[in-house]
């Protein structure tokens, strides 16, 4: 059966992409007049091009991630499972919600979600071998999407790895500040776009701190442009992994293992 969130397909420069009814996902129905005036935003998430129908674009603003706040109890009729962060529009008290796009894609395209979570569950069947040097230490990750948190936890569970997740980069950095040393941490995964502290801030602060500067950092993000990859690697990240690629995550863990935790014979 067709997913009611998917309106159909459009062709853009020879590429066919699905169009998602964003207001419907949020629980709103556009009137005929609104639909007539609506527009489609085309976006690229991890090399997946999608169209999102919206009633109107009020404007575009560039924000520093310190201006982005985690979701909280808004005391109003809003599905907080869809809202992961918020901010305020420039020079106003207008609240602007930031949506969990990964959750949107999973719900709008369940076949893609099934493949993603099936790949996480099948990790154990592939017989990957992880050294005790990595297994005995903990992987830390910063990720504001609940759906991706669940996915990453599933991958690490299947590999038999210890891990601890944080809802944003600032919470991760605050946790690192409480540690006397990094002996119990094998590596850090970080998203790029998060409230309070972005992945760029995580890399910058970890590299500036003598305690954490030698800890491996893997950027795990939907923002998979060449510019983003080049920028974070230049900042000192070890690897850049686009969401969602289970085999690449495992391969990257192995690369970290070989470089930082070589086994002696």
Where on the chain are the PLM-derived regions?
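Receiver (REC) domain active-site loop signature in two-component systems and cognate sites
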Residues: 14, 194
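Flexible, small-/acidic-enriched active-site or ligand-binding loops
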Residues: 1-6, 57-94
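Short amphipathic alpha-helix used as the core "switch/output" element in two-component signaling
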Residues: 200-213
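Acidic, metal-coordinating helix/loop segments flanking the phosphotransfer/catalytic sites
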Residues: 165-187
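Alpha4 helix (beta4-alpha4-beta5 surface) of REC/receiver domains from two-component response regulators
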Residues: 201, 223-242, 247
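Acidic catalytic/metal-coordinating carboxylates
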Residues: 168, 198-201
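Hydrophobic/aromatic residues positioned on beta-strands within the core alpha/beta folds
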Residues: 218-220
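Charged docking surfaces used in two-component/phosphorelay signaling
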Residues: 150-157, 170
């Amino acid at each position: 059966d067709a997913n009611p969130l998917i309106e159909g397909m459009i062709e853009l420069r020879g590429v066919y992409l699905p169009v998602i009814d964003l207001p419907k996902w949020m629980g709103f129905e556009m009137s005929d007049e609104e639909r007539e005036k609506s527009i489609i935003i085309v976006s690229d998430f991890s090399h997946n091009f999608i169209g999102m129908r919206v009633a109107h674009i009020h404007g575009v603003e560039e924000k520093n991630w310190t201006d982005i706040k985690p979701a909280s109890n808004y005391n109003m009729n809003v599905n907080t499972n869809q809202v992961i962060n918020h901010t305020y529009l420039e020079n106003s008290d207008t609240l602007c919600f930031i949506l969990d796009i990964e959750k949107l894609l999973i719900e709008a395209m369940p076949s893609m979600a099934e493949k993603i979570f099936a790949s996480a569950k099948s990790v154990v069947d592939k017989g990957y071998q992880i050294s005790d040097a990595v297994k005995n230490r903990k992987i830390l990750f910063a990720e504001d999407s609940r759906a991706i948190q669940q996915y990453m936890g599933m991958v690490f569970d299947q590999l038999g790895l210890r891990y601890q997740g944080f809802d944003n980069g600032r919470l991760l950095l605050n946790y690192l500040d409480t540690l006397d040393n990094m002996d119990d941490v094998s590596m850090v995964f970080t998203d790029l776009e998060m409230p309070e502290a972005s992945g760029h801030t995580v890399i910058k602060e970890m590299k500036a701190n003598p305690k954490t500067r030698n800890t491996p950092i893997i950027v795990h993000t939907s923002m998979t442009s060449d510019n983003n990859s080049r920028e974070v690697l230049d900042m000192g990240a070890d690897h850049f992994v686009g969401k969602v690629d289970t085999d690449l995550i495992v391969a990257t863990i192995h690369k970290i293992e070989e470089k930082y935790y070589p086994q002696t014979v």
